[in-house]
Amino acid sequence: MTTENRPAKIIEAHEIMTLLPHRYPFLLVDRVVDFEEGQWLKAYKNISVNEPCFTGHFPGQPILPGVLILEALAQSMGLLAFKTHEIKGGELFYFAGIDDARFKRPVLPGDRLELFVEVIKERRGITSFTGVASVDGEVACEAKLMCARR
């Protein structure tokens, strides 16, 4: 990943909501801090003590469910896809698959989940990515993901 001394490409929350169909409580990307079309994207999600999932996962010891970390990576992947391709009306990028998901540390209230996705390959409307979610530079989750354009 290189930015070649260019200004960061930022996507604010209001634009994220024009690109992704997700809404509270399932909009899991707060801000994109940089990206390179067709290559990679860096974003983050601030984890609040008020996340709805914490009422049951787990009472008294809240931990962000791994499936929501994967969904945040998938939404980051979708944002990169939307910023890379010219979109026809009503077209979406669907989460199509996941491989080799690994969870390495818990994500807790107060953490800032840093999201990084990078394109591996693209063919026939299917794009493969690697995704890494980290907190304070420590990997929390990594996986290979796929999305399909429909």
Swiss-Prot record:
Subcellular locations according to the entry: Cytoplasm
Enzyme Commission code: 4.2.1.59
Active site as annotated: H57
A Pfam family this chain is assigned to: FabA
Gene3D superfamilies per record: Hotdog Thioesterase
Reactions performed catalytically: a (3R)-hydroxyacyl-[ACP] = a (2E)-enoyl-[ACP] + H2O
Keywords on record: Cytoplasm, Lipid A biosynthesis, Lipid biosynthesis, Lipid metabolism, Lyase
Molecular function terms from GO: (3R)-hydroxyacyl-[acyl-carrier-protein] dehydratase activity
Keyword Transmembrane helix included in the entry's annotation: no
Superkingdom of this protein's organism: Bacteria
Cellular component, GO annotation: cytoplasm; membrane
Positions of transmembrane segments: none
HAMAP family linked: FabZ
NCBIfam families: fabZ, PRK00006.1
Family label: Belongs to the thioester dehydratase family. FabZ subfamily.
Function field: Involved in unsaturated fatty acids biosynthesis. Catalyzes the dehydration of short chain beta-hydroxyacyl-ACPs and long chain saturated and unsaturated beta-hydroxyacyl-ACPs.
Name of this chain's protein: 3-hydroxyacyl-[acyl-carrier-protein] dehydratase FabZ
Name of the gene: fabZ
